Protein backbone atom coordinates (compact mmCIF):
# COMPACT_ATOMS: atom_id res chain seq x y z
CA UNK A 1 0.00 0.00 0.00
CA UNK A 2 1.39 3.38 -0.99
CA UNK A 3 -0.59 5.36 1.57
CA UNK A 4 -2.35 7.13 -1.24
CA UNK A 5 -6.00 7.91 -0.60
CA UNK A 6 -8.34 5.64 -2.56
CA UNK A 7 -11.41 7.23 -4.14
CA UNK A 8 -14.84 6.34 -2.82
CA UNK A 9 -16.90 4.37 -5.32
CA UNK A 10 -20.48 5.33 -6.11
CA UNK A 11 -22.99 3.67 -8.41
CA UNK A 12 -25.08 5.99 -10.56
CA UNK A 13 -27.98 5.21 -12.87
CA UNK A 14 -31.45 6.04 -14.10
CA UNK A 15 -33.91 3.48 -12.74
CA UNK A 16 -36.76 1.70 -14.49
CA UNK A 17 -37.95 2.64 -17.97
CA UNK A 18 -36.67 6.22 -17.71
CA UNK A 19 -34.34 7.20 -20.55
CA UNK A 20 -33.31 10.71 -19.42
CA UNK A 21 -29.51 10.76 -19.66
CA UNK A 22 -28.47 14.43 -19.41
CA UNK A 23 -28.86 14.76 -15.63
CA UNK A 24 -26.78 11.71 -14.75
CA UNK A 25 -24.11 12.73 -17.25
CA UNK A 26 -23.78 16.09 -15.50
CA UNK A 27 -23.79 14.39 -12.10
CA UNK A 28 -21.19 11.85 -13.23
CA UNK A 29 -18.87 14.64 -14.36
CA UNK A 30 -19.37 16.59 -11.12
CA UNK A 31 -18.77 13.50 -8.95
CA UNK A 32 -15.65 12.58 -10.91
CA UNK A 33 -14.32 16.13 -10.62
CA UNK A 34 -14.94 15.93 -6.86
CA UNK A 35 -12.73 12.84 -6.64
CA UNK A 36 -15.23 9.99 -6.62
CA UNK A 37 -14.94 6.84 -8.70
CA UNK A 38 -18.24 6.73 -10.56
CA UNK A 39 -19.74 3.59 -12.07
CA UNK A 40 -22.42 4.96 -14.39
CA UNK A 41 -24.98 2.29 -15.29
CA UNK A 42 -26.74 4.60 -17.73
CA UNK A 43 -30.46 4.71 -18.38
CA UNK A 44 -33.26 2.15 -18.04
CA UNK A 45 -31.46 0.37 -15.22
CA UNK A 46 -33.13 -2.45 -13.31
CA UNK A 47 -32.87 -2.70 -9.53
CA UNK A 48 -30.79 -5.86 -9.72
CA UNK A 49 -28.23 -4.04 -11.87
CA UNK A 50 -27.77 -1.42 -9.13
CA UNK A 51 -27.37 -4.20 -6.56
CA UNK A 52 -24.94 -6.22 -8.68
CA UNK A 53 -22.80 -3.18 -9.46
CA UNK A 54 -22.73 -2.06 -5.83
CA UNK A 55 -21.59 -5.52 -4.77
CA UNK A 56 -19.01 -6.09 -7.50
CA UNK A 57 -17.46 -2.62 -7.15
CA UNK A 58 -17.63 -2.54 -3.33
CA UNK A 59 -19.50 0.76 -3.61
CA UNK A 60 -20.29 2.96 -0.66
CA UNK A 61 -23.30 4.68 -2.22
CA UNK A 62 -26.00 4.05 -4.80
CA UNK A 63 -27.36 7.16 -6.51
CA UNK A 64 -30.66 6.66 -8.31
CA UNK A 65 -32.06 9.14 -10.81
CA UNK A 66 -35.56 9.33 -12.23
CA UNK A 67 -37.09 12.16 -14.21
CA UNK A 68 -40.24 10.69 -15.68
CA UNK A 69 -42.30 10.78 -12.49
CA UNK A 70 -42.57 7.07 -11.65
CA UNK A 71 -39.68 6.69 -9.22
CA UNK A 72 -41.81 5.35 -6.37
CA UNK A 73 -42.93 2.38 -8.45
CA UNK A 74 -39.45 1.82 -9.88
CA UNK A 75 -37.71 2.04 -6.48
CA UNK A 76 -40.18 -0.10 -4.52
CA UNK A 77 -38.23 -3.04 -3.12
CA UNK A 78 -34.74 -1.72 -3.95
CA UNK A 79 -33.70 -1.62 -0.31
CA UNK A 80 -34.96 -5.18 0.20
CA UNK A 81 -32.72 -6.29 -2.67
CA UNK A 82 -29.75 -4.40 -1.23
CA UNK A 83 -30.38 -5.97 2.19
CA UNK A 84 -30.76 -9.45 0.68
CA UNK A 85 -27.36 -8.99 -0.99
CA UNK A 86 -25.83 -8.05 2.36
CA UNK A 87 -25.08 -4.50 1.25
CA UNK A 88 -24.99 -1.58 3.65
CA UNK A 89 -24.67 1.41 1.33
CA UNK A 90 -25.93 4.96 1.32
CA UNK A 91 -28.83 5.43 -1.07
CA UNK A 92 -29.79 8.70 -2.70
CA UNK A 93 -32.65 9.34 -5.11
CA UNK A 94 -33.23 12.46 -7.13
CA UNK A 95 -35.07 14.00 -10.04
CA UNK A 96 -38.70 14.56 -10.91
CA UNK A 97 -39.77 11.73 -8.68
CA UNK A 98 -43.55 11.96 -8.81
CA UNK A 99 -46.02 12.93 -11.53
CA UNK A 100 -47.59 16.24 -10.59
CA UNK A 101 -45.18 16.65 -7.68
CA UNK A 102 -46.45 19.75 -5.90
CA UNK A 103 -45.43 19.07 -2.30
CA UNK A 104 -41.79 18.03 -2.32
CA UNK A 105 -41.75 17.54 1.46
CA UNK A 106 -44.38 14.83 1.01
CA UNK A 107 -42.31 13.25 -1.76
CA UNK A 108 -39.22 13.35 0.46
CA UNK A 109 -41.12 11.67 3.28
CA UNK A 110 -42.32 8.91 0.94
CA UNK A 111 -38.80 8.10 -0.25
CA UNK A 112 -37.30 8.36 3.24
CA UNK A 113 -39.89 5.79 4.38
CA UNK A 114 -38.74 3.59 1.50
CA UNK A 115 -35.23 3.69 2.99
CA UNK A 116 -33.43 6.38 1.01
CA UNK A 117 -30.88 8.37 3.00
CA UNK A 118 -31.27 11.51 0.90
CA UNK A 119 -33.96 12.70 -1.50
CA UNK A 120 -33.44 15.49 -4.03
CA UNK A 121 -35.66 17.29 -6.49
CA UNK A 122 -34.71 18.02 -10.10
CA UNK A 123 -33.60 21.54 -9.16
CA UNK A 124 -30.86 20.40 -6.77
CA UNK A 125 -27.39 21.64 -7.69
CA UNK A 126 -24.95 18.72 -8.09
CA UNK A 127 -22.54 20.41 -5.67
CA UNK A 128 -25.19 20.33 -2.94
CA UNK A 129 -25.66 16.58 -3.38
CA UNK A 130 -21.88 16.04 -3.46
CA UNK A 131 -21.43 18.01 -0.25
CA UNK A 132 -24.07 15.85 1.44
CA UNK A 133 -22.40 12.71 0.09
CA UNK A 134 -19.07 13.83 1.54
CA UNK A 135 -20.78 14.53 4.86
CA UNK A 136 -22.58 11.17 4.89
CA UNK A 137 -19.36 9.32 4.03
CA UNK A 138 -17.46 11.42 6.58
CA UNK A 139 -15.13 12.40 3.77
CA UNK A 140 -13.33 15.70 4.07
CA UNK A 141 -13.02 18.00 1.09
CA UNK A 142 -9.25 17.74 1.47
CA UNK A 143 -9.36 13.95 1.00
CA UNK A 144 -11.51 14.26 -2.11
CA UNK A 145 -9.28 16.96 -3.56
CA UNK A 146 -6.21 14.82 -2.83
CA UNK A 147 -7.54 12.22 -5.25
CA UNK A 148 -7.43 14.77 -8.06
CA UNK A 149 -3.91 15.89 -7.11
CA UNK A 150 -2.45 12.40 -6.74
CA UNK A 151 -4.64 10.68 -9.33
Curated annotation (Swiss-Prot):
Keywords associated with the record: Cobalamin, Cobalt, Isomerase, Metal-binding
Pathway info: Amino-acid degradation; L-glutamate degradation via mesaconate pathway; acetate and pyruvate from L-glutamate: step 1/4
Subunit note: Heterotetramer composed of 2 epsilon subunits (GlmE) and 2 sigma subunits (GlmS). GlmE exists as a homodimer and GlmS as a monomer.
EC number: 5.4.99.1
The protein's name: Glutamate mutase sigma subunit 1
GO molecular function: cobalamin binding; metal ion binding; methylaspartate mutase activity
Organism: Haloarcula marismortui (strain ATCC 43049 / DSM 3752 / JCM 8966 / VKM B-1809) (Halobacterium marismortui)
Entry cofactors: adenosylcob(III)alamin
Lineage: Archaea, Methanobacteriati, Methanobacteriota, Stenosarchaea group, Halobacteria
SUPFAM superfamilies attached to this UniProt entry: Cobalamin (vitamin B12)-binding domain
GO BP of this protein: anaerobic glutamate catabolic process; glutamate catabolic process via L-citramalate
Entry's family note: Belongs to the methylaspartate mutase GlmS subunit family.
Keyword Metal-binding on entry: yes
Listed InterPro entries: Cobalamin-bd, Cobalamin-bd_sf, GlmS
Underlying gene: glmS1
